[in-house]
Amino acid sequence: MNRRKFLGAAAAAIPAAQGLLFAGAQAAGGQTPASQPAEPVGGDGKLVPRFGDARDWWFQKRFGMFVHWGLYSIAGWHEQLEWRGGVPRKEYEQLFSQWNPKHYDPDAWLDMAQSAGMEYICFTTKHHEGFCHWDTRLTDFNVMKTPYGKDALRKLADACHRRNFPLCLYYSVVDWHSPLYPNQGRSHELEPQPGDHPDREKYVEFVKGQVRELCTNYGKIGGFWWDMYIDKIKDTSINAMIRQLQPAAVINNRGFDEGDFGTPERDYDRSWDMPLSFKRRVEANQSVGMESWGFRKEEDYYSHRYLTSSIAKYRARDANYLLNVGPDANGVIPEKAAGIVRQIGTWYKPVREAFDETLPVSAITANRNVLLTRKGNSLYVHLYQPPDGEEVRLRPLAIAPERAVLLNDGRPVEWRLDIAPMEWKDHKPYLRLHRLPVEEFAGTTLVVRLDFASLDLAGIDGMAAKASGTDPAQDAAAR
């Protein structure tokens, strides 16, 4: 017998003789212990504020698809090719005459999104390059003047409206094409360009005009997603116009005022990982590709495990999540990217009950490697961090479930109320999950549902589970 087995056998006899273990502890599906503790436990259990108006659709549809598509898709390097690649403006604009996405089919995009459980879409109407995907009257640098000659946004909007699939619009304030934009060589800006006549006031009027077009000519809009407003000079009139024209539109925090929600991007700022729940509305955004948001010919992709963990990390804290793909120049989402999205759907659909209409209650356990949500008399355990082994400790939670189920495939999960050998001095049994199939599911994120006869979470203030740090979602300038 090796040392671990010997100590385990010896330790099993000691607490049993002292009456410290619950003799009735069973695997999932067995009888609950008659001597389970009656002490109530509790957690934060707070949702971020709802709007109380037409924007509340956003809390019913929490998982969306982001799409980055533009002239940069022709080159297939990066969506910021012109800036990062140091491509002269005149040379870059030669891509304009090549734009002809013959296989663009927005219904194919939406089919893929819905197959993964996504319920809304956010589309780049104008990225930093300044190219406009709609029939704008304010610049000729738009899709109608290309060989394609069709309003790409119109086609997408029509497809979305046929399905009652909310459409959100991305719009970059930075513009590398407009001679009015004050390019000064700051981050994500070109150097001052010959022949430009920068005028901030006139450019803001240009932006307002384009926003009015977008919010007037394409039916109901679910959201407006600003990006890269470098000056950060506040102008509440612009978002006010959006709200007047599109009352159901949620607006992010990257525009001319603080907007409705924060936007953590990729894992650039790890402080977003620290709160157990958010006080301000949040929509995280991530791409399937590691290097680019737009189409990249030589892209390396994130693993399924990484992406499902990222989704769980935010959804379990009452946040929305946007997952991005970059169609190629023909309008086709690369097969590898599409396969990743479909695979995420096979994970998301069985476990989504653990996210939808649940409360974040992670404060009831000291285990920082899991997140907990609650719905009625059920708790959901999200193993968003790769587990070290087959056991998950939920200390100090000491309530016996009636059953425990692995949502990924529906199999029962073993559990016990007992004392871990290394914690024998505490003499306080708590709930532990056992023999989880971590090797079999090593490439994905496990979610366990615990069903209780009655679940009273009042009484614990979460002191043992408080995470350090502040909530970055309160910072309207967070990116």
Task: Identify the role of each PLM range.
Residues 8, 32-479:
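Mature catalytic domains of secreted/periplasmic carbohydrate-active enzymes
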Residues 5-27:
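N-terminal export signals
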